[in-house]
Amino acid sequence: LKKICPELDSINIGGGFRIKHNLGFDYDYQYMANEIVSTIKNVCKKNKVDMPNIFTEFGSFTVGEAGAVIYSVLGEKMQNDREIWYMIDSSFITTLPDTWGIGEKFLMLPINRWENEYQEVHLGGLTCDGHDFYTSEEHINAVFLPKLDETPKEAPANGTPTGEKEPLYIGFFHTGAYQDQLSGYGGIKHCMIPSPKHVIVDIDKNGQLEDWLYAKEQSPLSMLKILGYVK
C-alpha cells in the first residue's frame, strides 16, 4: 500500500484486546503489544518503507472496566425439583444486553454475605421473557452465590429497627463497553423495565473516593409520557 500511495503514513489495526471477564483471566498485554509493533516493524523493514503511525480501536479494553451493574435478589424459587433460581430486581436483556444477544459473560461477584454458605444457582430476570436469564448453560461453567437468609438489616443510626431484611446484592463488573450504549437511558425498554439509577464513582484531588447520583431511576410517569398516555 505504501508503494501505491507514498503519502500513506498510518495504519489502523482495529480492536481485539481482551478484557477480564472471569477471575481466572491471564493475558500478557505487554507481550501482545510488543508482537504487534515488532511485526509491523519487520514488514516495513523487509519492504524498505518507513514505520507508520499505529492506531488501535481497543474499545472494550479501554472503557470496559469503567462500568458495573448492581442487582438485588428479590427471592429464590425451585424449578424442576433441582434447579435453584435467584430472581433479580431488573432484566438482563435491558441492562446487560450482550448476555442475551451474544451469550457474553461478565465478572460476577456477590457484594455482601460472603460469609454465608454458597450454592449453585441460576439467575433469572424480572421479565416474562424466556431468554432473560444468566446460567451455566449459556454463559459460564456454573454460578455459585451465597445462600439467602433471614438476617435483618442493621438498625439505623437512631437505633430504630426497620424490620426489613438485608437482600443479597450481586455485581456484574467490567460492563463499561456497549451495555449502556445498547440499552440506552430514558427510552422504552423490553417489558417496560425502567432504566436503573446511574451512580458515578470517582477519586477526588485528595485521592479519596467520592460518588454522586448521575441519573435517577426512570419513573413510570416518564415512560407513559413517551408512549403518549400522559401529556
Where are the predicted features?
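Structured alpha-helical segments in the cores of large, soluble enzyme domains
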Residues: L1-D9, I36-C44
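N-terminal, helix-rich and Lys/Arg-enriched segments in bacterial and organellar proteins
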Residues: I13, M32-A33
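Contiguous mid-protein beta-loop-alpha structural module that forms a pocket-lining wall or clamp
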Residues: R18, Q30, N53
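Conserved N-terminal phosphate-binding loop of PLP-dependent enzymes in the Aspartate aminotransferase
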Residues: L23, D28
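Charged (often Lys/Glu-rich) extended helix/loop segments that serve as interaction or gating elements
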Residues: E35, K41, K45, V49-K231
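Glycine-rich beta-strand-to-loop/alpha-helix junction loops that act as flexible
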Residues: I11-H21, T56-F61
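Conserved "cap/hinge" positions at secondary-structure junctions
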Residues: H21-N22, H174
